[in-house]
Amino acid sequence: MPVSQIQSNYYRPESIEEVIALVREANRNGQQVRVCGAAHSQSWAIYTNSVLMQPNVTNLDPPPSTSKELNLVLDKINHVELYDVQHHLVRAGAGVHLGYDPSDVTQTSTLENSLLYLLWHQYQLTVSELGGITHQTLGGFLGTGSAGGSLKYSFHDNIVGIHFVDGEGELRYANRDKDADLFHAVLVSMGLLGVIVEVELQCEPAFNICGQEATVSYQQCAFDFFGESAEKPSLLDFFNDVDYGRINWWPQPGIERLVPWQAQRQAQVVGFTPRPYQEFTAYPQVAEPVISIIYAILGNLDNPIRLYEKVQAGDIAIHKVIENIHDYKQFGVFGDMFRQLVELLTLATSDAFNAFVIANRKTIKEQLPTILAQIVSVFQPLDSDRLGISAGNPQVFQDHAPWGLPMDNEASDEFLDIEFSELWFPVGRSAQVMQMLRDYFDSETDPNKKLDRTGLFMIEVYMAKASQAWLSMGYSDQQDEWRDGAVRFEPLWFVDFAENPAERFYPQFWNLFKESNIPYRLHWGKMLPLLNKRDGQDTMAYIRRQYPKLADFLALRERLDPQQIFVTDYWRDHLQIPAKG
């Protein structure tokens, strides 16, 4: 059976029948099978064992072409068809991207062949809720339990049926009402129960959103982020009041600010004119490449050759900085050094750049809190510090829902290549979680050491509606404290930083809440604990205990995939999947 491939790294089945044939062949040959969507998850979570010798980062190069294992891409299974007009029921191939994916491994993704575009323009329909980006494929977004920011709406509410190929090559169907256990098991299953090939969605009529984003100090914020004020609404009140929301938190010394984004639904009206949201409104067109190079410099002070090589390889767009930054003085004490570093990065050899970094890195490190505060004041100034007609006012926006809800869609994977670990908590603990984080940060009085705790970039804070999916991070049986939904936060880490955040950064957060016996879960597609040390093993054991249906999931997994063709060493170790037989 001919199956097209990309550079021999991926198999690209033309149809569901080809997926079935590939799985049956893998079953006979004892090969692993995994599926890549948009490669937005950690690479070890996506691919077969062939990538385990490569770094575990997002947006990684594909598996080695020498691999005999099967890494599938379902870009050709991307149909979208309305099959029940009255009930807004749609069938969609699992390989269809939610929106345009600029980093699509097949380079076939367009806005016009995306799920949201086709729903909107062909059927005047949409889905209830979306994440911060829509680069993902439908199957990938479901498989990792990803979500946007809402306690009222959930993408899971749109899913009514799932077609998947199990480990023996049988095409199975799970219906939300008729096969509740199977449906809720496969809904968030990380590819461990089979290959999701088609999804049935109950969509809703197209709608718009309107909203605002403020940049404020803790004191200026309209709600009390830490839940300690008797006069202001709480963070939980904010979550409950808005239809959709997110807060970007900058907890670093000298910065301490919040960037709450909020939106409400609006009905479609004739003559509606979108006013799209813009990130980094001070410099919306320039911010990303400049932030990228600044953070790459700050994250590689002890290994400058690594940064130089990335620039020379074209991985970091130094030309964008040269073309767009004309006033280096706005960066304060870092301005002149930044200008010289940019110039040295363009030279044919690394000697001068390395020498300059080595000569100045002690000064940069000592002044890092001041440098960072000045950088953030340039790109994320307080509304009260703005000039002109925007002074003191939040950014106001309105848009069609599929393009307004994913507020980070314009963020470039090239410029802002970010890694995450995302911690989910019962939403009723919102104030407790934020207070614990703040107190942990503030207990370190040395500004430089405090930056080691906060990191150099922002922390995203979202909420999510409860889910019945067995391995959803927001799973609830409606009798537990998760029933009202979840609050979640993710400290952001640049891929271009030299250190490994799974060793250097994220364990402090995992341990803080584990040691206080605060229930939390980790996003399956993002960074999980390393298991080469006892501490990581203990953390993962703690995480597994937060899933009441995990044992049921693993038992069902064994029945659906007895030869364990979907099980990689990564998932075996993290979920404690018993060996075959």
Q: Predicted segment positions?
A:
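Noncatalytic alpha-helical scaffold of FAD-dependent oxidoreductases
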Residues: 1-581
